[in-house]
Amino acid sequence: MKKQKQVLALLLATACLLPQAVSGGSLLAAETPKQLDVVVRHDTHSHLNSFTTVTESGTEEVGGFSRMKTIIDAQKEKNPDTLILDGGDFSMGTLVQTIYEDEAAELRMLGELGCEVTTLGNHEFDYRSKGLANMLNNAAASGEDLPELLVCNVDWEAMEAAGLSEGQQIIRDGFTEYGVKDYVVLEKGDVDVAVIGVFGKDALACAPTCELQFEDPVEAVKETVAEIGANEDVDMIVCVSHSGTWEDERKSEDEILAKNVPELDLIVSGHTHTELAEPIVHGDTYIVSVGEYGKNLGSLSMTQKENGRWNITEYELIPIDTQIAQDAATQERVDAFMAAVDTGYLADFGYTREMVLAQNESIEFASLNDLEFVHTEHNLGNIMSDAFAYAVEHADGYDGNPVDVAVVPSGGVRDTYGLGDITVESVFNSYSLGIGADGVPGYPLISVYLTGKELKIAAEIDASISDYMTTARLYMSGLNFSYNPNRMILNKVTDVYLVDNEGNRVELEDDKLYRVVADLYSGQMLSAVTDMSYGLLSLVPKDAEGNPIEDFEDVIIMEGGKELKAWDAIARYMQSFPDTAEDGIANVPVSYSEIEGRKQVEDSKNIADLIKNPNKYAVMIVAIVLIVILIVVFIIRLVVKLIKRMSRKNADRIVKK
């Protein structure tokens, strides 16, 4: 009887628990998957204000933090736990950069937008170690809400082992003051997100003034992910990367990162200014990019899968244009920073940012994409290189030594010119990078000498190397050349010559020295171009006596004790144009609507065109190929002889048996 009561009690208890178990199971089955909304941007390059540029739709006004703020506020009203991320290169590209060091306007305005995380891009190093450190110190001193600054692959251990340089120590102190970290964990509602920052290999190659050493990005991110796994309990791992993507997947740094660190759920990919209409996907890792200068914001929604990984369920590039209202408070802050530019930096040059230098009535200048990705002559490169030559030959104290060639690399060009007024601000924005030895923003012009033989190499650099390093596309005044893209690498140029002021052809003399004008950045980047060609295409800039230049800051062009800035050279050239409308304002000559034959493409696959006039590099390559073929033939013949000999021996053994 007692046993029967125990069984009955057990059945009753089970019956009581069953509804709860069923109810709990139903709740689990119906539980909503975790979700996260993310807004991303990168490569805004000091574009706090909206600006006029040339797009596929023509000349239009785009960008601006006040319009971004409107979009972000609307998103946060919908979901207060939206994650706001930036992929670096937040500075260098407009007049705002002239107050970068003292005001830290870019970082402070990222905070104004509610951005929670950013990383360093190569252009954050443009004002050298002291400039970066001062910016970080002043940002921290502002007391404002600022984004976390994350970089996981600075190799402090290696630098400490060698002994920190003064510049490295200055940056380290700035990092400490600001609170730079490898990663951070953010709570976004019920989602715990680990965010890592990383600085890429190509970014470092594009930062000639950077004194820091970096670990391999992939290895550093792997180590950081392992650290997060050991010490944190997170739902998602995101990487803000200033590494970029390329068409060639084998060289596409953030794709390499995604493949080698599969634990990453999302990579915000900066540096290459890529605009991805759809994410790149490798395994469970998504890569997103939204383009440059704040022309777009990226908006995406992610949903967690049953296995704990995430899907992007919504992805949109939101154009930032005049259809979006400006947030008044944000625009007021931007205007205050711009007023400081007028009364400070520009006053020293005798300009204001809205001052009209020239009017462009009808000329469609090439876009930035054209300069980098359409390998031919472009009128934007022509007008800028002409400006460099003009400014040097019309500067106070000009020594009478004419400029033979002026060079503009596509990597130095930051914007184009639209129709209508060309202002001081638009000219500065078009060639805004860097700082001189004087500590004043803007790369100065330098004057060097190259031999005729080296000028031919410069043409070959554009023809052969710039497809692999698009920032090395060269636009030149005074030097014309033709190339055939189908010819052997390092042997693509078929004709190269000088053009005098009357437009006459002048043949180059291999050993003669020619005066060449470029900006300081071009000189600093020569080593990267040499590395890209494995040392085969090497230029050695010289002084007028033919002595190699050891420090490009020694050959900066000075005027009245001040550096002649590249952007100011363009501004002066614009002002020099004739006033054809007779309204007191210069007009861009219609001649710039035409291509002049400075860089001609001979797209021929005719065998005679492919092999005619081979240069020494072609001969070297052919010789190497022939030697390799001879070695292979020799090895094959040797193997054949050995096989025959062994066959004979085996046959002899069989006969003897």
What are these model-predicted stretches?
Residues 28-323, 387, 449, 466, ...:
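Acidic, metal/ion-coordinating pockets
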Residues 32-40, 46-61, 65-71, 77, ...:
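Catalytic centers of hydrolytic enzymes
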